[in-house]
A protein has these predicted regions:
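Acidic/His- and Gly-rich active-site-bordering loop/insert found
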Residues: 2-103, 107-134, 139
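Generic non-transmembrane alpha-helical segments
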Residues: 7, 11, 15, 22-25, ...
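Soluble non-cytosolic domains of exported or imported proteins
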Residues: 34-38, 158, 221
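Short Gly/Pro-enriched turn/cap motifs at secondary-structure boundaries
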Residues: 55, 156-158, 193-196, 343-347
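Alpha-helical metal-binding/catalytic segments enriched in His/Glu/Asp
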Residues: 97-147, 200-206, 212-237, 271-273
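Acidic/histidine-rich catalytic neighborhood of metal-dependent amide-processing enzymes
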Residues: 111-195
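Midchain, well-structured core segments that form catalytic/ion-binding scaffolds
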Residues: 168, 173-321, 325-326, 346-354
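Zn-dependent metallopeptidase/amidohydrolase metal-coordination segment
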Residues: 333-358
Length: 358
């Protein structure tokens, strides 16, 4: 470990309590995708306090802090921290105002880039850097609240439901040559990544006819029955999904009716259709649409299926030698173990980091 690396670690250790306090504040004020207004403001204020040039409003809530912008012609490196949380109302540390909780650890990502910013803005360290560093707080990695994101799309505020996809579309990565993304996990320190699923998202809306559920059900058109048949038809498609494609389709009913004694006249389903490659995503998506269409035809309800772009499949990433060496140097003399990622390992989950790699 050279003198600069030692000084970086010293700076982070010196500000340990401040970094942890920032993380805990974000943790207890979790916000959902494209709604991270408080989180965004906190990140902006912290980066400004360090004397960085800061810009905000990227993909609604994204924030960029620039170190050494005069050197961006050499290399421009982004350190990325995701801001959004998950809607988990029953979580012990849920934010009661948003019903969100940081179950995926994005608060730790933000603490990571804040800690890096504290260290790298040290004048003695900053002058050793050959390029620009961009501390980038990004929105909406978790792909929840599909209908809300569709509303933003219809309002012209976004085109893509995923934060990094939208940032790419806006050109927010045009001044960045490479990005470093990190995430909490089971291992002490894991460098590199395996592959992961991509997906499209869908909203299925069944429109029936209300009637008294006991007195005159024959006068109604039961949208919930149409949805139930659609879900059953989808279940019968599962044997056609090949294991090698790692297909995952997991719908939820977000609206199932209004009153127990009224035939449901509107039912809404949201789902992701995931797979390991684009051809498999297209195939599974077509089968999913046919299944939900069948439910509507069987019952005689109207229906509307909206399909939105999700994320591209995540590509494997070999452990970068420089990152690996830095991780090993930083953990030397500690109990932390540095491991190279198994690039052959596939995850059924998804991340919009995949869109950065394509």
């Amino acid at each position: 470990m050279d003198a600069t690396e030692s000084r970086i670690i010293e700076q982070i250790d010196r500000h340990r309590d401040e970094i942890i306090a920032f993380a805990r504040d974000i943790y207890t004020h979790a916000e959902l995708g494209y709604k991270e207004f408080r989180t965004s403001q906190k990140a902006k204020e912290f980066l400004e306090k360090l004397g960085l040039k800061v810009e905000d409003g990227f993909a609604i809530t994204g924030v960029k802090g620039y170190l050494n912008p005069e050197k961006k012609g050499n290399t421009s490196l982004a350190l990325i921290g995701e801001m959004d949380a998950l809607r988990i109302p029953e979580h012990k540390y849920v934010n009661p105002e948003t019903q969100a909780a940081h179950c995926c650890g994005h608060h730790a990502q933000l603490a990571g880039i804040i800690g890096a910013a504290i260290a790298l803005t040290d004048p003695e360290i900053a002058k050793t850097l050959d390029g620009q560093v961009v501390f980038f707080a990004v929105p909406a990695e978790e792909y929840g609240e599909i209908e809300y994101k569709n509303q933003l799309k219809e309002q012209g505020k976004i085109v893509y439901g995923g934060g990094k996809c939208e940032l790419i579309r806006e050109g927010a990565f045009d001044d960045i040559d490479l990005s470093v993304v990190h995430h909490t996990g089971d291992e002490d320190v894991l460098v590199g990544s395996g592959t992961g699923n991509g997906f499209v998202s869908k909203i299925i809306r069944y429109k029936g006819k209300a009637a008294h559920a006991a007195g005159a059900p024959h006068l109604g058109v039961n949208a919930l029955n149409a949805a139930t048949l659609g879900l059953s038809a989808l279940a019968f498609q599962r044997e056609t999904f090949q294991d090698k494609d790692s297909v995952r389709v997991h719908p939820i009913i977000t609206k199932g009716g209004n009153l127990v004694n009224v035939v449901p006249d509107e039912v809404v389903i949201e789902t992701l259709v995931r797979a390991a490659n684009i051809d498999a995503i297209v195939d599974a998506d077509e089968k999913t649409s046919r299944a939900f269409t069948a439910g509507a035809y069987a019952i005689g309800s109207d229906y509307e299926i909206t399909t939105l772009p999700g994320y591209l499949p995540n590509l494997a990433e070999e452990a970068n030698p420089a990152v690996l060496a830095a991780a090993e140097a930083a953990t030397a003399g500690t109990s932390y173990k540095v491991t190279k990622a198994d690039t052959g390992l596939h995850s059924g989950g998804s991340t919009d980091v995949g869109d950065l790699k394509h």
